[in-house]
Each structure stands twice: as C-alpha cells, then as structure tokens.
Amino acid sequence: MIKKEDRKFKRIKRHLRIRKKVFGTSERPRLSVFRSEKHIYAQIIDDTKGHTLVSASTLDPDLRARIAKTYNKEAAKEVGKLVAQKALSKGISQVVFDRGGFKFHGRIRELADAAREAGLKF
C-alpha cells in the first residue's frame, strides 16, 4: 500500500520535472494549479518577475456563496471560469498551463476546460 507521504513526494518530484520545462513570461504567464483534499487553487504567475498576477480558489468569498461543495468538479469549473475572467480583465489572454504534478483528469481537467471556454488560450 502506498502511503500518503510517498504519493505527495512523487507528486512534488513530478512537479519539479515539469517546472524545468514550463516557464511563464510577461507575454504568456503560467497558470499554476494546486489541488488539496478540500479545495482547489489557481494562480497566474509571471516567472520573470516572480509575481502572482491573478488568483482564484474555492476559498474566495464570492465563489463560496455560489457553490455547495468545494472539492468536486463543479467547484473546479467555477474556479476555472473565475480565474479566466480575472485574467481577461487584466489583459491576459494566453497562458502556459502548469498542472502541478497532478494527473490531467478530474478536477484539474475541469478547471482547465472551464478556463479555455471562458477565453484563455493554452
């Protein structure tokens, strides 16, 4: 049986491997996703400056009022829409997607698809 610490360590190793290749610039910042057991977080980061330009999560007060649960696909879809709306309002239309070492399915995929539908290109 794989312990929880082993899974977390393997995910961190995958994320470091991905981060060697995925780099956000001012023209195409990085859309970074983190998934915990209860929440999902998305940030758009300019790696050249080291600044977070836009962020959204299931902890946002306006999003909490609209969703019943914070750990399902519907919540991830709402976070994807919200981060895309915030990015487009700041003039960001193209990003590089960083899945954070997680598999591209389930909540991660729903967030990415919702962000694409809302107007982000990646």
Swiss-Prot record:
Pfam families for this protein: Ribosomal_L18p
Biological-process GO terms, alphabetical: translation
InterPro entries documented for this protein: Ribosomal_uL18_bac-type (IPR004389), Ribosomal_uL18_bac/euk (IPR005484)
Domain of life the protein comes from: Bacteria
Keywords: Ribonucleoprotein, Ribosomal protein, RNA-binding, rRNA-binding
UniProt key word Magnesium: no
Annotated CDD domains: Ribosomal_L18_L5e
Keyword Signal annotated: no
GO molecular function, one term: 5S rRNA binding
Cysteines paired by S-S bonds: none
Cellular component per GO, a single term: cytosolic large ribosomal subunit
Function: This is one of the proteins that bind and probably mediate the attachment of the 5S RNA into the large ribosomal subunit, where it forms part of the central protuberance.
Self-association and partners: Part of the 50S ribosomal subunit; part of the 5S rRNA/L5/L18/L25 subcomplex. Contacts the 5S and 23S rRNAs.
Family: Belongs to the universal ribosomal protein uL18 family.
Entry protein name: Large ribosomal subunit protein uL18
Gene name for this UniProt entry: rplR
